[in-house]
Regions:
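Thiamine diphosphate
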Residues: 1-32
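Conserved thiamine diphosphate
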Residues: 41-90
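Glycine-rich, anion-gripping cofactor-binding loops and their flanking helix/strand elements
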Residues: 150-198
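Conformationally flexible catalytic loops at phosphate/diphosphate-handling active centers
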Residues: 79, 83-142
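Active-site-proximal loop->helix
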Residues: 11-13, 28-47, 51, 188-189
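Glycine-rich beta-alpha junction loops
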Residues: 29, 96-102, 152-154, 179-180
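Short gly/pro/ser/thr-enriched loop/turn and capping motifs at secondary-structure boundaries
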Residues: 3-6, 29-34, 41, 64, ...
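Short internal beta-strands
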Residues: 24-27, 95, 172-179
Length: 198
């Protein structure tokens, strides 16, 4: 159905706001059938707008003559994975256009199964040197009212025990985002609903 892609939208919005890596794959009409009102055709180009981190509209399979299709698809898969995981996690969208026949046909997938190799994607890691950490500690201790903001999914980056010790030693007031994964019962210095105060 041309409207089926709309059913993914709530999940994509949730993934966007919760920083959840998600790869959305949709099937589409061929490029030449999109603009003249073919049955059940919805414009799927960037249909999710800024709710996805990355979008690609692939070439129609019959237009890939002379192209190593397996390599082409592996590269797209690697790019999709990288975009969904790098920097801030989030959803990405791959749109696959097809020409008729769309119904199931006989297809030998043996070569794909035998030649399958895992995709290797190297994602950079953020690291901080000791000078930066020392500078951060010095600024916190010299401040009259140091504040720490725990953003969405902060629980994935720091453990409860380490956070509690850090807050206690540096005398921090902590503003806790509802999506951070932490609760105010950890310490009396943790403040929920800080946006109301601000």
């Amino acid at each position: 159905s041309g409207t089926a892609v709309g059913n993914f939208y709530p999940a994509i919005m949730e993934a966007k706001h919760a920083n959840i890596p998600l790869i959305v794959i949709t099937a589409d009409r061929s490029h030449e059938e999109r603009l003249y009102g073919a049955n059940q055709t919805t414009d799927q180009i960037k249909i999710y707008g800024d709710k996805v981190k990355w979008f690609v509209d692939l070439a129609t399979p019959s237009n890939l003559n002379g192209v190593d299709v397996k390599l082409y698809l592996k590269k797209i898969a690697a790019q999709a994975y990288e975009h969904s995981m790098f920097d801030t996690n989030g959803p990405v969208h791959i749109n696959f256009p097809f020409r008729k026949p769309l119904e199931p046909t006989q297809l030998d997938l043996t070569e794909y199964r035998i030649d399958f190799k895992p995709i290797k994607v190297i994602l950079p890691e953020y690291t901080f040197d000791s000078k930066y950490i020392k500078s951060l500690i010095d600024r916190c201790t010299s401040s009259s009212f140091p504040i720490l903001l725990l953003g969405p999914d902060a629980h994935r980056e720091i453990s409860k025990d380490v956070l509690t010790k850090f807050v206690s030693q540096l005398n921090l007031t902590v503003f806790v985002d509802p999506l951070s994964g932490f609760k105010s019962d950890i310490s009396d210095r943790f403040i929920l609903n800080y946006d109301v105060i601000l």
